[in-house]
Amino acid sequence: MESWPWMAVVVLLGLTVRWTVSLSSYSGAGKPPMFGDYEAQRHWQEITLNLPVKQWYFNSSDNNLLYWGLDYPPLTAYHSLLCAYVAKFINPDWVALHTSRGYESQAHKLFMRATVLAADLLIYVPAVLLYCYSLKEISPKRKIASALCILLYPGLILIDYGHFQYNSVSLGFALWGVLGVSWDWDLLGSLAFCLALNYKQMELYHSLPFFCFLLGKCFKKGLKGKGLALFIRIACTVLASFLLCWLPFLTEREHALQVVRRLFPVDRGLFEDKVANIWCSVNVFLKIKDTLPRHIQIAISFCFTLLSLLPACIKLTVRPSCKGFRFTLVSCALSFFLFSFQVHEKSILLVSLPVCLVLTEIPFMSTWFLLVSTFSMLPLLLKDELLLPSVVTVMAFVIACGTFFPMLENTSEEQLQLKSFAVSVRRHLPGFTFLPRIMQCLFLSSVITMVLLTILSVTLDPPQKLPDLFPVLICFVSCVNFVFFLVYFNIVIMWDSKNGRNRKKIE
């Protein structure tokens, strides 16, 4: 318990950084007619407050779906409604139907930022603290350090408090789910993850590891006895939670189908804007987004996604463990980001959360990944005029991680979790003893490339014939890094012989 005062200091530091970033610009500030995600969140408050539930997801004269139509699950809509009631109490003009479109003021900005902070404090921050405090076999100092580094992760701060979204809500629920199933509170863990999934459909990135881990637990208990009972209880919990969230939309079949259509808009294409995944990178050379029929794009992305995540999921099902679960969360989320259909640049945050959870186990690789994930969103951050907050938060994160987890000192085969893999390789190549040096060189090359591209993007104008040169280069470089990380995490998973024997609650 003596570490809790220091945990309080960590929280205050994290909140200070968050609120400082919130003083900066936001998505679409002063840019009519569509503005940006800030206006989207405000508009959803306007719609949910002034229209009946049955009209929230339907196009009408009062709800133009082409103007930031609601396209997130019901729990997001309920959250918007809750915020709308508070907004109406403070100033009804903020959420007045039609007349509030594009509303901007310092008071309203303060309110919107405060709603993000409140959600963070209620859901995400407590989950992070509990997770770090519950880590086993590490010192209290290391627990505090891990909490500090996670709370200072710049990607989430810049998107939620700069660009403006509520990612901490879905990620927080997902983290509560991780805690629940890791402690064998499987029903509570399942409920928490269902809340995450009903807040943002992109939490599907984490769904297969949850399913495989819980299914593996049921298999271990025996599907003819306790395992079957556990499976039924979990299934009932999932069905009940979805039923409660979707109840207002299940009165009519067409209503439910319309919500599903809004959640999965296949007409938007293979990817949006510049995103650091395989399809956007390949599209630079082969215009697959424009030449291939939409159903072929969906089929190809589905097949590649499934093939890339299948090995890790199979192993987790056969040999369920807390450690395997965390690493499979990383691998599967990264597979979805790289290969799935309709990916946004901000979806990398879904990979960053589980990477934060393995920070104490592989600090070198985790820190490296988290830096690349933030860099991959640089075009969006520059568009929102968030260069200064980006530089400052990244530097703060690097200093924190470098102080408590000296990165270049944590690159031995054991610390990289690659000992088993290296031993296997040395059976065929006895001279393969330079893996740590390779990783250090790759890290330095990656960091230098990111720094150079950042400087070039800020200081130089692109050629007139290539206006998107720097965003494309940033996405391509980030994608190459992510493919490398996908290979790395799968090697760790497949060569880890401890997964099947490890039964500790939180390692």
Curated annotation (Swiss-Prot):
Pathway in which the depicted protein is active: Protein modification; protein glycosylation
Gene Ontology CC: one annotated term: endoplasmic reticulum membrane
Molecular functions per Gene Ontology: dolichyl pyrophosphate Man9GlcNAc2 alpha-1,3-glucosyltransferase activity; glucosyltransferase activity
EC code(s) of this entry: 2.4.1.267
Glycosylation sites: N59
Compartments (UniProt record): Endoplasmic reticulum membrane
Reactions catalysed, as given in the entry: an alpha-D-Man-(1->2)-alpha-D-Man-(1->2)-alpha-D-Man-(1->3)-[alpha-D-Man-(1->2)-alpha-D-Man-(1->3)-[alpha-D-Man-(1->2)-alpha-D-Man-(1->6)]-alpha-D-Man-(1->6)]-beta-D-Man-(1->4)-beta-D-GlcNAc-(1->4)-alpha-D-GlcNAc-diphospho-di-trans,poly-cis-dolichol + a di-trans,poly-cis-dolichyl beta-D-glucosyl phosphate = an alpha-D-Glc-(1->3)-alpha-D-Man-(1->2)-alpha-D-Man-(1->2)-alpha-D-Man-(1->3)-[alpha-D-Man-(1->2)-alpha-D-Man-(1->3)-[alpha-D-Man-(1->2)-alpha-D-Man-(1->6)]-alpha-D-Man-(1->6)]-beta-D-Man-(1->4)-beta-D-GlcNAc-(1->4)-alpha-D-GlcNAc-diphospho-di-trans,poly-cis-dolichol + a di-trans,poly-cis-dolichyl phosphate + H(+)
Transmembrane segments: 3-23, 115-135, 144-164, 173-193, 230-250, 298-318, 333-353, 362-382, 386-406, 438-458, 469-489
Pfam families: Alg6_Alg8
Enzyme class: transferase
Topological type in the membrane: Multi-pass membrane protein
One of the GO biological process terms: dolichol-linked oligosaccharide biosynthetic process
Domain of life: Eukaryota
Keyword Glycosyltransferase: yes
Residue ranges annotated as Cytoplasmic topological domain: 1-2, 136-143, 194-229, 319-332, 383-385, 459-468
This protein's record includes keyword Methyltransferase: no
Keywords: Endoplasmic reticulum, Glycoprotein, Glycosyltransferase, Membrane, Transferase, Transmembrane, Transmembrane helix
Membership in a protein family: Belongs to the ALG6/ALG8 glucosyltransferase family.
Protein name as it appears in the record: Dolichyl pyrophosphate Man9GlcNAc2 alpha-1,3-glucosyltransferase
Organism: Mus musculus (Mouse)
Gene designation: Alg6
